[in-house]
UniProtKB/Swiss-Prot annotation:
Protein name: G-protein coupled receptor 83
Role: G-protein coupled receptor for PEN, a neuropeptide produced from the precursor protein, proSAAS (encoded by PCSK1N). Acts through a G(i)- and G(q)-alpha-alpha-mediated pathway in response to PEN. Plays a role in food intake and body weight regulation. May contribute to the regulation of anxiety-related behaviors.
Main location: membrane
Signal peptide per UniProt: 1-16
Transmembrane segments: 71-91, 107-128, 145-166, 186-207, 238-259, 293-314, 327-347
Natural source organism: Canis lupus familiaris
GO molecular function: G protein-coupled receptor activity; neuropeptide receptor activity; neuropeptide Y receptor activity
Amino acid sequence: MGRRGALLCLLPLLRAAERPEGRADEPGLEAALAGPNASHFFWSNYSFSDWQNFVGRRRYGAESQNPTVKALLVVAYSFIIVFSLFGNVLVCHVIFKNQRMRSATSLFIVNLAVADILITLLNTPFTLVRFVNSTWVFGKGMCHVSRFAQYCSLHVSALTLTAIAVDRHQVIMHPLKPRISITKGVIYITVIWTMATFFSLPHAICQKLFTFKYSEDIVRSLCLPDFPEPADLFWKYLDLATFILLYILPLLIISVAYARVAKKLWLCNTIGDVTTEQYLALRRKKKKTIKMLMLVVVLFALCWFPLNCYVLLLSSKVIHTNNALYFAFHWFAMSSTCYNPFIYCWLNENFRIELKALLSMCQRLPKPQEERPPSPVPSFRVAWTEKSNGRRVPPANNLLLSSHLHSGKTDLSSVEPIVAMS
């Protein structure tokens, strides 16, 4: 058993395990360790001096968990759960319902939504309940499953965002090359999940359920990492590898891909004779696309940077644990599951139509047909169209001449903010 790694990981959870008011008549952990209750701890490889040293270190940054803080956390995490489930389930519903939207790009969007749903269901509620109850109540099996779901979902999300960025780069920078087929998209998604599983297994395997008698009437459990020796180095380099593979490398690829795309969209020239109104419309669309690409990178970087840095610094022993910081950073990272559906799909016309139809059904309007478009065929262009041979269908009534497809120029109307996800 890795002593130091497990001991350091115990810090934030055992702080949360303290009584909210910290009354003197409650023995708590220190009394249990110092007195006869020490035998109630189910640890086989620790000496009593280890626990005495740990109790002394536990005082760093200790803060009480009062009912107000717990209530705020319940509201904050509930907000994430509700909006994440609603947005991501709606994304899957819209894409599976519309056959025109079934392309490789759509598969990546669904895969991202599934990863967000997985972490919303198998990690976010467990973190909340663990904090509110000051103990792990889900058993040994879920101790491993929850940690695996957290890391696997994060890897899948990062790799899928990278795949989407590479796909957008391919479409815009090389418009004459064949698109990724649905079959290849399925293969790429399989590879993504295989890689995510491989990277997540060490975290899941090293989880262990520890049980101790907190007081005469209370027995509590903690789901914590239990790294093999040398535990310090194992923990440090595992978190470092996760930080690089889960955050730095995907962010670097996404940033480079979208920077090149933004440059191409901004510098590309309008082909053919267009009016001033048409030119201004294309320029607005160009700015809109660039803003969306920048938003994707910024949100991905901002949401995960605090938590990744906190975990990395903690495993490197640069900082001590801080309960308030941990839950603030964790909530901020988990909130990223709410943003992706709106970033990638909210500006898509088909998505808006299905959302209006769904809301009409929920409200039981007498004439829901009024919310639907007059014709299933759009008058300007068809989003996400793709033939089986991987080439795009030329849009009708386009502002730009179709002859530019043979000149290697980029058609702005086919690359709306991921927007049309063409």
